[in-house]
């Protein structure tokens, strides 16, 4: 173990603190606000408080990420959406009224590849690339009530859309990434290039990770490769040259 994170609600705000484990794994102590580099010689870092807040508050919706209806609707044990609905404790924080959510509409659409990829992007990217003001106007999170793959925000904001803020990066084939998601061509998709990088200023997620998530990368890659490669042809994007 390297780190435990504790979050709680105070009188008017969220508070959070990271605890670093001792080398003998018998105790923890509050990590310094600047974080810890190469914690216990693992090659992994405990992020600084500033780095933590860059994600835990990005959209202004809430400080907690990874705790929403879509992610809780599973059968893997522990706390689930079904538990919260049964207890009657699930509420819409913006109105105080019971949330209009059910086990039927809190689902990811599409086939198995699409559901896996949308779930991964929602949980790992959608908290910054989502909400009322998504980063780079790219929506990678999903919403309750989706019934078809075309309903997913990524289909409108990333598939066949030109890259922004990351132009001129060379891909595996000596060319340049131009589209965020190039249907049928994961190797040409900027989102894959970002996920594959661990270069500061290029990698995604931008903080809190210094190793590529190979399983997640393969999941998103498989979905992009399964998309119809001609889906951009009806309205080909005119992207500026790198």
Segments predicted by a language model, with ranges:
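Electron-transfer interface patches adjacent to heme c in soluble/periplasmic c-type cytochromes
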Residues: 9, 74-118, 127-242
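The −1 position to Zn-ligating cysteines in a subset of zinc-ribbon hairpins
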Residues: 51, 124, 203
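Generic signature of intrinsically disordered, low-complexity segments enriched in small/polar residues
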Residues: 22-24, 68-70, 123, 176, ...
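Extended surface/linker regions that mediate inter-domain or inter-protein docking
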Residues: 1-119
